[in-house]
Amino acid sequence: MHRFRLVAAACALLMAQAAFAQQKEWIEYKNLDDHFALNTPGQPTVEKTMWVSEYDSKFPETVYRWTDGPNRYSVSVVDYSDSEALYTANHHTDDFSAPAYWQIDILGSIQWAASQLYRLKPGVKVTFDNFHYINLVTGQQLTVINPDMTRSYVAIYLHENRLYILDATVTRNAPAPIAFQQSLEFLDAEGKSVRYRTYYFDKLPEPKLGRRGAGQGTQGPLPDPGAPANGGQGGRGAGAPR
């Protein structure tokens, strides 16, 4: 019995050492290309891909990923700067051909991402879903329980026409990953942290193709870009042709 206890203790020590070895040193990670900084477990792996927007435009997306033991962290950055050109190049039905829709694609990007990646994902239970801001940049924050009982802490922001999706997925009993989620900073062209004196809402890019669409920034309400023929209100709805 005594020998068994010694073996069990040795195994427990080895497991603890292995778990400790898996933990990574956290650093302040800065990315000048996508203009953000935050605390992360080391350097990321980087994947270039494409993001499909609500109105079927395809935007360049960069996904930065980290792991720390069983926990997974990511920042996805989608650049909506060319929304006008990309939307105009697509073939849309008459219901969705109004120039304002490329702007609506940007303005609705936070809610679109939240719904497509989390709210509508099969087997996911949303336990928190509300307006949020960090450094006065407005966005949305969600907490979800995944089918494998891990928990994802999500924050989504839109800054300078870039969509930022932060996801920290941790084991069932792990503490909330505050060090990752609450350390986000937005950087200017010189790599300095951006600070605002009041709430920041994204400013739309200047139209370049001769049709001004819905106006600039978020300084006033969007005009009706043309209601769909079926009388629907707002957005395109599930399954609606574009």
Predicted regions and their residues:
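N-terminal "mature-domain start" segment
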Residues: 22-60, 123-125, 133-136, 195-202
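Short, solvent-exposed coil/turn segments at beta-strand boundaries
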Residues: 39, 43, 68-72, 137, ...
